[in-house]
C-alpha cells in the first residue's frame, strides 16, 4: 500500500483469520481452507483460478509454507494467470524440483530468490552462488525465462541473462525477516501501476534500498525493520517522482 497499490487482496489460511484481521486493515481478505499442515489447501484451486481474472498482478509464496499443496497452487497460478506473477519464498521452494514450469506461464514472471533459494533452484551450494552471482542469475533465467532478482549484498536483476542491473542502495541491516516479502510487495505494486516487470524490479530494489539507508541513519542497522522501511516509501517515491 505504501508503494502505491490501490487495492490489495490477501489470500491466507482461514485458521489465521483473527491474527490477519487485526494486522491488515488496508487489505481485502480472502480466507482459504487449510490442509492438515495448517497451510492453504489445494482444494481452493478453483476459487484461486476465479480470483486470477480479477487482479492486475499476483504475488505467490510469502509465508505460505512448503508442501505438495503449495506446489499445486503455485503451478495452477502459473498455468492460468493472464497477468504478471511474482514468485518469492515458499513459492520458489515449492517449485524447486519443477522450476521449468515457470516457462509455461503466458504472462511475465518475476522470481526473487535469496542465495539459499537460488542454490536450491540450481542444485549447488550457497557459496557457489555467491562466488559468481551474475552467473547464478543467468542460470536461473535460463531455467525459468523470468525476470530474476537475486537478492543479497548488491542485489542483481536480469531479464535476459546478458544485461544485469546491480543495485547500490541498501545495507546489511536490511537482512532481517520480512525484508524480502516487502521487496516482493513493492515490485507487485509497481507492476500493478503498469510499470514493466524488469523496470518494476529495478525500481523496487532501488527504492527499498533507499528506505533501508534512511532507516539505518535514523535508528542504526540494528533498528532497521521492514515496518520502518515501509513507512519511508511514500517520501522516497515522491522524491523520485520529482
Predicted segments, located by residue:
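Small-residue (G/A/S/T)-rich helix-start motifs and N-terminal tracts that mark the onset
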Residues: 1-86, 93-110, 115-242
